[in-house]
Amino acid sequence: MSLLSDNIYNKQAGRDEPKFKIWRNAGLLLTYKCNAKCEFCYYNCSPQQGGLMSVDMAINAWLSLKELAGDGAPAVSKVEPKIHITGGEPFLYWEHLLEILQEAKKNNLGPVDTIETNGFWATDEKIVEEQIKLLDEFGMSRLKISCDPFHQEYVDIELVKQLASVAKELLEHDRVLVRWEKYLDKPVEMKNITADERNKFYVEALKDYPCRFTGRAADGIAELVASQTVEQIAARNCSNAFLDAKGVHIDPYGNIFSGTCSGIIIGNIAKRPLAEIWENWQPSSDKIIETLFNSGPAGLLDEAIEAGYTQSKLYAGKCHLCTSIRQFFFDKGLYKTVLGPAECYFL
């Protein structure tokens, strides 16, 4: 188990300065492939994307988190290290998902905290029952079901209702999370409507449930709610986003993203253990990360504009500006070791 003092940045920070917190949870992006192509995707997942995290990588990531946060962590933080499995859509690779859970159980890694799905596969009640029972048997703590206007463009709401109903019968209600329950009770018809009607539902959903504008979300729907000038955004840096991140996301290729900052690679678990990456992380290790840490995305503007970036009048927020500039740098082939993989950007 690592201590706060094991990190390079923390060693140099003053006693009263904020410290770089130990990552205590990790999301395993099983794949970037998804049956849907949601407008608010934090990555750029779609049926055309790929990648599949190997069983070995998933187990190594799980072990690596336990080594970093440690079984001793609860005595200090009262927070157990947690793993959740997401995507893309994990249920596209059902047998592979089961194999990961089997190996985790065999290695006594404890339960997977959450498995996420959009419910596209819940076409038969018997199949749903069988799969939920298997997930329960292999130690899944909670099932998280996506339910919102964005997903319902691609997934029949009746399938989502069937999945939620069966899951709540077989598991305790607090082990089934529907995001968002409002749209399960009162679905929004997203098919056979005009573009204006669709955009109206998007905006209403974003008002009720704020979204982070990274990945595909920064390309389309962000424009619908863009209301902040660069001057307003410039006052906010990203130091807290890095220092206070509760965990990381690890993609199918081993790339590690801090918190929810998709497309900004801070390490690769295929090359170094998570504990070693955490212990050696400091903002000065990379130019882009150092700029974001100290000045936020507005700090990248001068370089981007000089290289040909066209600044918009308004942005939906700090993450929208950041993703827009990073997309420009990515298109230019700049900062290749940090900006990636391609599945987080538009080609």
Residue positions per predicted region:
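Conserved alpha-helical substructure of the radical SAM core
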Residues: 2-111, 115-117, 122-127
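Flexible mid-to-C-terminal extensions adjoining Fe-S/redox cofactors in radical SAM and related proteins
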Residues: 13, 263-347
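Structural motif
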Residues: 18, 75, 135-136, 240, ...
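Residue-level signal for mature regions of secreted extracellular proteins and peptides
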Residues: 27, 31-34, 254, 312-315
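Short, flexible loop/turn elements at secondary-structure junctions
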Residues: 32, 89, 117-119, 149, ...
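Short cysteine clusters
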Residues: 34, 38-41, 254, 259-261, ...
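A general structural detector for well-ordered alpha-helical segments in enzyme core domains, enriched
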Residues: 58-61, 65, 100, 130-134, ...
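Radical SAM enzyme [4Fe-4S]-AdoMet core and its adjacent flexible, acidic
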Residues: 133-281, 335
